[in-house]
Amino acid sequence: MFNWFRRQFGKDNTAPESAPPEGAEVSPELAPEVIQAETESPSEEDSQTTELAAPPPEEPSSDTANPDDYLQWAKAAYQNIQARKAETVSPPESAAAITVEAGIEETAEEIVVAPESDQATATEADLPSPETEITTGPAWLQKSDRLEALKETAVEEATVAGTLTAESMAMDDDFMWSAKVLAAQGRSAADVSAEEIDWLRKLRQGLSKTRVNLVNQLKSIVGQGPLNEAAVEEIEAILLQADVGVEATDYIITTLQDKLREEALPPEQAIEFLKEILRSILDRPLLSLPSAEFAPEAEGLNVWLLTGVNGAGKTTTIGKLAFMAKQSGYDCVIAAADTFRAAAVEQVKVWGERSGVPVIANPGQNTDPAAVVYDGISAAQSRNVNLLLVDTAGRLQNKKNLMDELAKIRRIIDKKAPNATVESLLVLDATLGQNGLRQAEVFAEAAKLSGVVLTKLDGSAKGGVALAVAQQLNLPIRFIGAGEGIEDLRPFSSYEFVEALLNG
């Protein structure tokens, strides 16, 4: 099982902890050109298997590697992905559908928490089915719920169509770029999965709007030697348009200017140096932390609070995180504590069904969010799960109310689960740019934030806001979203982000 939370990043890293797949008996017709290139005796099935399971001998470890090495690495990775696909034959569609439906029904039944104290706790009898809830209440609420349900259905249909699988994968330009990024991080071709290739493809495409406006203009400027005043002003304008922010822009220009005074760099080398600057900005908030890794602790309960303004994608992020946690081998529960926004609880339940994760909710109106969190902790403890995800209200009308609510939730957690590892993540809409950053400053004051989840990168030309978050708020980017699908949220890698931003 591939653990997305503990996936290792960074240039020249060793292979990840997850063990490489066992050697597969690969049919020559899967990738004949690779077999002929890498085996001296193609007729020997065992020798083919051994060579495919082991890393190719010429795996590149840096951007200076020979392009032919990357090509061989990509071919080997492609062949291994296809070999694993051949090993695991998919069940018939009807059986798969039955399994999924059964899982969803079982999940719906699990939205039950037995009361453990005087706190009000939701029981199965109290929780009407989604159909019942949508048909009760005022007409305006019914209409709102129906719209939310239709919206979620539309997103789900779009999700399936946009996901790349081993069957639909081709060795196209996206695959070659993704393979090069993975190889440059020291990854083994035997360890690469179709899911990783698919994610890097989406990240590259998601940052294309920012990249088109950024790279070509920068190359034409930085390749002309030391920066004069006109060049500085032009670079400043380019970076600010990408919402890099004033502080980060000043730092980038100063550092780049100092370097170009020392030596004249051709455009490609200047861009490589610019990549180093950007990575240093993104990684700086991690320097003061004990570990750069952000993953649920294997032992004990982890409580992750998700905060952010309405419309930033907070509830959607909850569902995607739950799905990723389950895929990575963690047991997870969601607490629907956003009781302020209409239909928020219903939206969380839809995402819970999709991800196959139980949702703890209170069907009453104007429920105390802290009571829902209490019930969520009780459910997590009784089921011995690793991770509790808490959806909180996205309010900025009154900072005092926000601070009071978050403080009350933290008190409940400290009392009910004193040994839990508590993290607070801010969900930020990348399309808002600097406006979103100002909202983030309010949440940073109200909550002890552990990091930021940057969403909607696929619809924005303002991907530079990630640099502004790191520079101005000194907050690490923990996860990024580049699509509407349930698999389109992944842990953040400064190396992969910068490569997609400047070298895509």
UniProtKB/Swiss-Prot annotation:
Report the locations given in the UniProt record: Cell inner membrane; Cytoplasm
Its keywords, alphabetically, are: Cell inner membrane, Cell membrane, Cytoplasm, GTP-binding, Hydrolase, Membrane, Nucleotide-binding, Receptor
Residues that coordinate or bind GTP: 308-315, 391-395, 455-458
Q: Name one GO molecular function term.
A: signal recognition particle binding
State the residue spans of region: Disordered.
1-71, 116-135
Biological process, per Gene Ontology: protein targeting; SRP-dependent cotranslational protein targeting to membrane
Question: Do you know which Pfam families this protein is assigned to?
Answer: SRP54 (PF00448), SRP54_N (PF02881)
Entry EC number(s): 3.6.5.4
- Report the protein's function: Involved in targeting and insertion of nascent membrane proteins into the cytoplasmic membrane. Acts as a receptor for the complex formed by the signal recognition particle (SRP) and the ribosome-nascent chain (RNC).
Q: Which NCBIfam families match?
A: ftsY
Query: What is known about its subunit structure?
Result: Part of the signal recognition particle protein translocation system, which is composed of SRP and FtsY.
Query: In its UniProt entry, what is this protein called?
Result: Signal recognition particle receptor FtsY
Q: Record the organism.
A: Synechocystis sp. (strain ATCC 27184 / PCC 6803 / Kazusa)
Q: What is the lineage of its organism?
A: Bacteria, Bacillati, Cyanobacteriota, Cyanophyceae, Synechococcales
